[in-house]
Amino acid sequence: MADASRLSANFPPATAEAWRSLVAKTLGDKPFSDLEKTTAEGLPIAPLYPPGDLPGGQAFPTRPFDSERPWDLRVLTAHPDAARANIEILGDLEGGAVSAVVRIDPTGQAGVAVGSAEDLALVLKDAILELAPMGLDAGFLGPKAADWLGAVAKSSPGAKLNFHMDPLSAFAEAGTSPGPIESHVISAATVGARLAETYPHGELFLASGRVVHEAGGGEAEELAFAAAAAITYAKALVRAGLPMAEAFGRITLGLAADADYFVTIAKLRAAREIWARIATACEADPTARIEARASRRMLARQDAWNNMIRMTAAAFGAAVGGADAVMLGTFTDAIGLPTAFARRQSRNAQLVLMEEAHVGRVADPAAGSGYVEAMTDQLARAAWAKLQEIEAAGGLAAALASGLIARDVEAAKAARPEPKLVGVNAFPPAKEHPVEIETPAPKSVEAPSPALPGPDSACPALKAIRLAEAYEAAQ
């Protein structure tokens, strides 16, 4: 007798061969390949994923499950004025954010004008560091900014600080480093090892692949870059005195979350698989810690209101993919600094997914999906092959200097099909409705130079792009 508790038990067994036979009748003279598609990155999409064709069982641990607060809602402040940046952070925390990142730029052109611990203290005034983790995005100033943050938090040794030094991303984006890039990695590791003694919960390095994504690279290139950066930083921390297991435990992976949420889901799951493989070989914790930031290359200036939907799709993909922290930015980021309204919309997009849609109530909800499992496996394999190429070239710094990374990014960019961008080259508005942005007065401060002794390093720069830019310029 059929088991009434299983719906499938009430139907005769189906096979892939029987399904394909029926499809052939429908297709007639057309080839079966007409049903096969590819993603924008060239990954194959099959019309059906029979259970027998799925990759093996899950090879990676997911993030620790917490149904009440499934991920860290993280915000970024880049307002040049320190006092205004402080107001933004406190407002975000009161509005539902869990943590914040301060982008530092002493010139005030691309971040908060901070040049000392005193400046940073003003930015973080009244923030309770034991409850609200604070992080940094400081480029080559990372080690100095990390010391500033450590000084600001000296009365809060239990604070979970995200120092997130990442000199390799700064090098890749700028195409040069003020002094040898190897010295910058060593300097960051030395500072990190010292701070690790005082802040046992601090995250020292951010091994981010987003610079590859923003320059037009594919998912495999982004994953390989992040993994290679993690290996470089772990080795540097070990040389600075940390045990291997602790070194890996102090590194966070940084990845981009795109509006193509299936790709985002698969990419984050593939990142966990790659991390587990590397960490297990080094006898470290195989559970990756991932910070997902919304892609900036997907944003449009024209009909920018659509960016809200793009951001929400990115947040959904990051959450379902298992990100530990999600930072969206705002829908006006392609135009200028956000208003309080734009910041609130960004927070609320995540809060609705978390509190109303209950996206985080299930651990790894995409597990078992043939499409997602196959894409996860394909991305992990492709990224692993590229990681081996990077390591064979001498590591990430050498691969950047040789042009290997830039060539891979350019090849991926050239192979990408023309995108369809709603409000730009598809369904443009009859009338543009401008968005409001902040236009602050210029602000800059004196700051120590990030330069280190020795000749500057150079590499082909990975310059950020926006997919909509060419279409907007043509109109």
Residue ranges and their predicted role:
Residues M1-D260, C282, T287-E291, A319, ...:
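Catalytic alpha/beta active-site cores
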Residues K37-P44, D166, S208-E214, A247-A257, ...:
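A glycine-rich phosphate-binding loop feature that marks nucleotide/adenosyl-phosphate handling sites
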Residues H201-A234, I309, A315-F316, V320-K386:
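Mobile "lid/hinge" segments at catalytic clefts and subdomain interfaces of large enzymes
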Residues A2-D3, A18, R344, N348-Q475:
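Catalytic-core signal marking the mid-to-C-terminal active-site face
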Residues T15, W19-L22, G42, A85-E88, ...:
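General structural feature for long, well-ordered alpha-helical segments within catalytic domains
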Residues A227-A230, L253-S346:
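Glycine-rich anion/phosphate-binding loop at the beta-strand->alpha-helix junction
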Residues G42, G96, A153, W275, ...:
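Conserved, mostly hydrophobic/aromatic
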